[in-house]
């Protein structure tokens, strides 16, 4: 299988997009402590990522609340259950790690939920930025806490929850 990639500019820095002919398999931050770059043997193909780039631009402009892109994250069954729960957090809202653990039917797995959240290969599209500490504090994020805060503020401004 050929791994394709492209970069997408965003207000929180450049994003690395990875996928194949059928689905997006990764969206990573290409700056910061956990920055990712293209792997050896990956093939650059900007044309294959036009749709997701357009949808990301709409998201950052406050015009899109859900993404319509085929996703294929690779992970364990537990990780994929956490990532599915993340996708169910409504735009503009947050949940705690405990909330997610309860949602997947394993309330004692708070730390494991945190680990799965940290290994989310599809940042923004699988909205791990919407997960916060039980006390309401911002916790780790691959793009850095400033980016997490920016994403939450963007969604808060455009969610209509406080209008």
Locate predicted features:
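…primarily DNA-binding HTH/wHTH and HhH modules…
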Residues: 134-163
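Flexible interhelical turns and helix-capping residues at alpha-helix boundaries
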Residues: 90-93, 117, 121
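Major-groove recognition helix of helix-turn-helix-like DNA-binding domains
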Residues: 86, 111-119
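Short Lys/Arg-enriched helix C-cap and helix-to-coil transition segments
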Residues: 124-131
């Amino acid at each position: 299988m050929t791994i394709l990639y492209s970069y997408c500019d965003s207000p929180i820095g450049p994003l690395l997009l990875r996928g194949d002919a059928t689905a997006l398999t990764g969206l990573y931050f290409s700056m910061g402590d956990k920055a990712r770059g293209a792997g050896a043997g990956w093939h650059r193909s900007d044309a294959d990522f036009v749709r997701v780039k357009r949808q990301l631009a709409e998201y950052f402009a406050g015009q899109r609340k859900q993404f319509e892109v085929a996703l294929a994250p690779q992970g364990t069954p537990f990780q994929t259950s956490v990532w599915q729960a993340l996708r169910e957090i409504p735009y503009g809202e947050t949940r705690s790690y405990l909330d997610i653990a309860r949602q997947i039917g394993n309330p004692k797995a708070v730390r494991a939920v945190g680990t799965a959240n940290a290994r989310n290969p599809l940042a923004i599209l699988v909205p791990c930025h919407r997960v916060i500490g039980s006390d309401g504090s911002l916790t780790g994020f691959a793009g850095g806490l400033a980016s997490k805060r920016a994403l939450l503020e963007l969604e808060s401004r455009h969610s209509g929850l406080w209008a």
